[in-house]
Amino acid sequence: MARVEIEIPDDVTAEVDHLDLTVEGPEGSVTRRLWYPDVDVSVEDDAVVVASEVDDAKTDSTVGTFESHVANMFHGVSEGWEYKLEVHYSHFPMQVDVEGEEVVIQNFLGEKAARRTQIRGDTDVVVDDEEVTLSGPSIEDVGQTAADIEQLTRVTDKDTRVFQDGVYIVEKPAKGGA
């Protein structure tokens, strides 16, 4: 019999459409499907209510998980999420660019072919010399884009003690930061 109310911030609106919760604010909007058997998500007055009539551990933990998702959505649309990555190279000067909806890394370890990865969702990517900044309203989209960029420059066939070239996440939001 878990019931949690998450207060909606002043500059944010929330709306439930069947199983999808849509949250809009000054930084953008985020939609997420929140479904689990016997767990109901609704908007009442100035709060999002996550409730369940079933009293078991799995359902109670799911209510807590949904509470965290909603809090992350509120934080994302009001303040946004930000990751910082740094470009490191010692052998070949690599170049990181944004082309449309892709991040392109050229001359990684002297490779002639460019490495590419998609930018997810509403994530903004800003490349400033040796620093890459990712920001957006969805923590999942921003975090996954950062991880994709980091994995794109992973060195697998050389000694990583010598070849430390790559793009690495150096700053990300703290857990429980919402």
Swiss-Prot record:
GO terms for cellular component: cytosolic large ribosomal subunit. Pfam families: Ribosomal_L6. GO terms for biological process: cytoplasmic translation. Keywords: Ribonucleoprotein, Ribosomal protein, RNA-binding, rRNA-binding. One of its GO terms (molecular function) is rRNA binding. InterPro entries: Ribosomal_uL6-like, Ribosomal_uL6-like_a/b-dom_sf, Ribosomal_uL6_a/b-dom, Ribosomal_uL6_arc, Ribosomal_uL6_CS2. Belongs to the universal ribosomal protein uL6 family. HAMAP family: Ribosomal_uL6_A. This protein binds to the 23S rRNA, and is important in its secondary structure. It is located near the subunit interface in the base of the L7/L12 stalk, and near the tRNA binding site of the peptidyltransferase center. Part of the 50S ribosomal subunit. This is Large ribosomal subunit protein uL6. It comes from Halobacterium salinarum (strain ATCC 700922 / JCM 11081 / NRC-1) (Halobacterium halobium).
